[in-house]
Amino acid sequence: MLNSTPTPIDARMDALERHLKNENPELLDVVKSYRELDKVAHSVGMLPASESLATRVPWWPMVSVLGTFSAGKSTFINNYLGAKLQTSGNQAVDDKFTVICHSADGEARVLPGLALDADPRFPFYQVSRDIEEVASGEGSRVDAYLQLKTCPSEKLRGKILIDSPGFDADAQRTSTLRITDHIIALSDLVLVMFDARHPEPGAMQDTLKHLVSNTITRPDSNKFLFILNQIDNTAREDNPEEVVAAWQRGLAQAGLTAGKFYRTYDKEAAVPFEDDSVRERFETKRDADMAEITDRMAQVEIERSYRVVGLLEKLAKRIEHEVLPTISREKASIKRKVLWGDGITFGLLGAALVTLTVMAGYWDGFTFAPPWWDGILADPILSGLMLAVLVGVFGYVHYLVRKFVVKSTLKRLDAHATTEFGEWIANAMRVNTKSWRTVLITGPAGWGPLSRRRIASVLRDADRFVQSLNDRFTSPSGDQTPNPAIQSFESENDPMARLPPQDEPAEKHRGSPSVVGEAST
């Protein structure tokens, strides 16, 4: 009987499908397309059989809050959630990356970083490996970098919120910068906060470079919102607008010359305003900017669905148009080097053999005529043995040349495997250069008609998924009939609409991944 026990990655994918069935059913078919894409990635060797491309994206909307020390990130999060979840103040003690999600039992809890590192539903799945790559020995200390907090706030239903420790690129550990880049890549919305009480951005150019310069050139730069927080502290300045102007100049020097620049502060902790007109002006600006920020945060659920589908299409095209051609080029390079190596080596061996036989007097003009030659040719056994020896010598020399070329190629690829793409190529080339594979075939192993059909099917599915999402949230014909999907989305973001009937338990209502009580998944 065949063993039908699912592999760990299959079990994780099955668990993901079960959660999506209850919480985001429109993405169920997308998971199946990721499974098809995994088959191609496994067959060409770019991805180990124990991994899935689906784990490279969190399946729940994600909002991250980055910023400098004392920028008010924790206070902003507490006000947004309506709960004192994060420690705030000038000497905040939360020095870890904190993932915040909805609580299943209505209680606020703090869970260790291991809860994130081992769960593919969250954005830090297996992040310990990335930490270990840049800081040897630190991968086992994942709890020193990460923590998971749960909160019963209704605003967390359907999304994940991430709070980061105060950012300072000058003093930041490489491992912390790696995690920050990981967050930025996966987030649907990134709030970048600065402290208006420190109006000298010129003194923090490295930090601005990492938080601004490296983000505005990204294809998804529209997901970044730059916020000047605690702006109320400038109310007593002779010219408060100059503080804002100083920050705008500093950000412009870092490359941010366009885009929205928000100004906020905490009303409860605001400094007293001596002039009512100044207070009213600050509050009006603050309320308008906060409304825009919270509206963008409410929209991430829609953006996440498009982003997951977009990544599926991007991965399929990247495999077909980047990974596979790169594998073919590397194999062609190996073929060329091996043939040249064989030619040079056999040429040198041939020249040495001719020289030795000439010195031994085995040549009669241009005819090879040693005294034992006719006897070997006349005996089929001896001639067969001699032919076998020659073939063996030539084969062994070819093996040594091939081994040297492959080893040097893999060493070079491993040195460039610091990126996801580089790792894929290194993995694939190990599979494509197995000793039993000939170097004469430069096409990628595992890439055939079936894999081509799978890629084409995934691309068709991606287009269909986008059209399905468009049908849910748009009406190109101008039909005035309310779209049920949009009505559902708006009701989900209305706290009053989320309250369950008195005779229906609250836990039946849909939410983001709620970890308490779900350890088995």
Please state what every model-predicted region is.
Residues 223, 231-304:
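Canonical P-loop GTPase G-domain recognition
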Residues 105-107, 166-168, 197-200, 231-234, ...:
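Conserved nucleotide-binding/hydrolysis micro-motifs of P-loop NTPases
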Residues 125-159, 172-254:
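Conserved C-terminal guanine-recognition region of P-loop GTPase G domains, centered on the G4
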Residues 307-349:
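Cytosolic-side membrane-insertion boundary helix
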Residues 168, 179, 423-521:
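Charged, low-complexity cytosol-facing tails and large interhelical loops of integral membrane proteins
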